Amino acid sequence: MNLSFLIFLSVLQGVTELFPVSSLGHTLLVPALFGMHIDKHAPQLLPFLVALHLGTAFALLWYFRKRWCALVRGFFASFGGRRNDDAHMMWALIIGTIPAGLVGLLLEKRLERIFHDLRIVAIALIVNGVLLWFGDRLQRTRAHQAPEKLTFRQAFFVGLAQIGALIPGFSRSGLTMIAGNAAGLTAEKAAEFSFLLGTPIIFAAGVLELPKLFHAPGQLADALLGGVLTAIAAYLSVRFLMRYFEGRGRLASFGVYCVIAGIVFLGWFLLHPQPV
């Protein structure tokens, strides 16, 4: 892979994976818009993208390292009968991870077909933007609660939202933030829960695809470099986003971007059909 293209793709992935704008959608749409060819049929494409996802997962683990240590301690303490907010939160994350994990394993091959029609991806990005706008309005009309106080049913509901992000164009972080808002979380707490919830899914997807990466000739070096670049971009992104939502940042801003970008992408690919 060309070095400049590798750097571009890695940074794009690291930023858009955490911003609620669909990383996979942008990874497919942006290069095509600028004439950067991605062979969607290449067997090494998905493993390479997953290597970038691993970089994101490590960035999230490092940023929330103190939080994860407390959650893990609370989880093991719960087996001894000592339940606290950290234990409750950890069990909520486990329950929330189940839906997307199961659906991803069962429908992975069928969902890959959507990658081949960029018009569908662009439409999904527009819908994602509309959902973010409604989610922002919803967040401002709900009573707020701490993420540790989410019921397990609410955590499962937030986890269900991740399923939509298996379709390129829909954002995992965006959909889970919207679901968190619906459950009564503040924008800041919904973002934190979303990032914590996404970490095991992103990490597990990478681990499952690693065998394909090792069997792709010449891809290991590219993947390692891409993973490091993505990790740096993702760390800077999560730090920015947490501060953004702490400062009363709004999902609606990202919703407007997704709608405008989706319309631009859709118009371009309708006028310039891409080979599938």
Curated annotation (Swiss-Prot):
GO terms for biological process: cell wall organization; peptidoglycan biosynthetic process; regulation of cell shape; response to antibiotic. It is an enzyme of class 3 (hydrolase). It is found in: Cell inner membrane. InterPro entries: UppP. It catalyses: di-trans,octa-cis-undecaprenyl diphosphate + H2O = di-trans,octa-cis-undecaprenyl phosphate + phosphate + H(+). It comes from the Bacteria. It is a multi-pass membrane protein. Its EC number is 3.6.1.27. Belongs to the UppP family. PANTHER family: UNDECAPRENYL-DIPHOSPHATASE (PTHR30622:SF4). Bacitracin is thought to be involved in the inhibition of peptidoglycan synthesis by sequestering undecaprenyl diphosphate, thereby reducing the pool of lipid carrier available. Catalyzes the dephosphorylation of undecaprenyl diphosphate (UPP). Confers resistance to bacitracin. This is Undecaprenyl-diphosphatase 2. It comes from Paraburkholderia xenovorans (strain LB400). The gene is uppP2.
